[in-house]
Structure formats: C-alpha cells, structure tokens
C-alpha cells in the first residue's frame, strides 16, 4: 500500500503523483488533475474513498469499472494507467483530457458545426462499436461523460454504470 504524503507547502503526493486541483465530483469521491513526479506528465486521478463504498453493490460497481478500464485500449476510450491503493482510498490514475466535457464545449459555443458534429459522432460510434465487440455496455453515455483531448477528439469516460454481456 502506498502512503499519502502532505508536504510543508500543502501539496499532496500519492505514489509517483502530485495531486492538483479538483476536476469533478462523483458518488465515491472526486477526480483531480495530477502530475507524475518524475516525468511531469499530467494525468486525471479518480480518488475513490473506501468508506463511501459501503454495500456489496457498491463494491461490485467499483470492481466492474476497474476491470473494464483495465482491458479497454482504444483511442476514443480514456486509458487507465495504474491503480494506487492507500489505507483509505483507491486512486485510479488515468489519461488526462485537457479539453474538458463535450457538454461544456457545446454550451460555450452555443452550437457545433455540422462537420465537427459528424467527427464527434464518428469517434463515438467507433468507441461504442469497440466496447460492444468486447461485450461492454457503457449505459451512461451523455455529453458530460465525453471528454475532449487537446485536438478536440472525444474520450469516453465514467464506466461506473457499465456492465459486461455476452451476445446471444
């Protein structure tokens, strides 16, 4: 198990990652931006507080999300790099999508041009088709769960409600 280290200046480090500002909040904790202490690479860190994962359904949900994130490898699906565990939390170290939510992108622009919307749709279809080939159903696709990278490419995130299935 890793340790949480709080420096004199107030910065928190877990494993090889320095925790930064909050990016969002979820059922079991929050998502923060992080920086790898050796490489300087920016990452998203989903902090899951173990004391909020109370019943069997919660444990199953978190385990299923982690299992799914471990097997998916597609340019449109956010990548899980590693998991750091402490006594009180699980830290899911993931790919950081700097562009934020597709929802905010659309709201800020008030509209999306047809060519750009088609690009988003094709990327989304590519990601969903890949997930379905693996027998994974996301079950919570919405603009808030579609993030964007530096080049405005879609990244599917938040597999908390996802499940696996066998065709037939």
How does the language model describe each region?
Residues 30:
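Conserved N-lobe ATP-binding subsite of Hanks-type protein kinase domains
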Residues 35-43:
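Conserved N-lobe loop of protein kinases adjacent to the ATP-binding glycine-rich P-loop
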Residues 42, 47-72:
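Conserved N-lobe beta3->alphaC-helix segment of eukaryotic protein kinase catalytic domains
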Residues 83:
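Activation-segment/catalytic-loop signature of the eukaryotic protein kinase fold
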Residues 88-101, 105:
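Conserved short submotifs of the Hanks-type protein kinase catalytic core
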Residues 120-121:
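Activation segment signature within eukaryotic-like protein kinase domains
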Residues 124-136:
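Protein kinase catalytic-loop region centered on the HRD/HxD motif
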């Amino acid at each position: 198990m890793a340790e949480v280290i709080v420096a004199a200046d107030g910065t928190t480090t877990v494993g090889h990652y320095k925790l930064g500002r909050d990016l969002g909040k979820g059922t079991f904790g929050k998502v923060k931006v992080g920086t790898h202490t050796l490489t300087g690479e920016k990452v998203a860190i989903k902090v899951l507080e173990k004391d909020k994962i109370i019943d069997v359904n919660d444990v199953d949900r978190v385990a299923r999300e982690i299992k799914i994130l471990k097997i998916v490898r597609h340019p449109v699906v956010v990548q899980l790099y590693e998991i750091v565990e402490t006594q009180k939390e699980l830290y899911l170290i993931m790919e950081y999508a700097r562009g934020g939510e597709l929802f905010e992108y659309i709201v800020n622009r008030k509209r999306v041009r047809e060519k750009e919307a088609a690009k988003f749709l094709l990327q989304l279809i590519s990601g969903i088709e890949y997930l379905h080939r693996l027998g994974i159903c996301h079950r919570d696709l919405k603009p808030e769960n579609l993030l964007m990278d530096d080049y405005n490419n879609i990244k599917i995130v938040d597999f908390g409600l996802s499940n696996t299935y066998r065709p037939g």
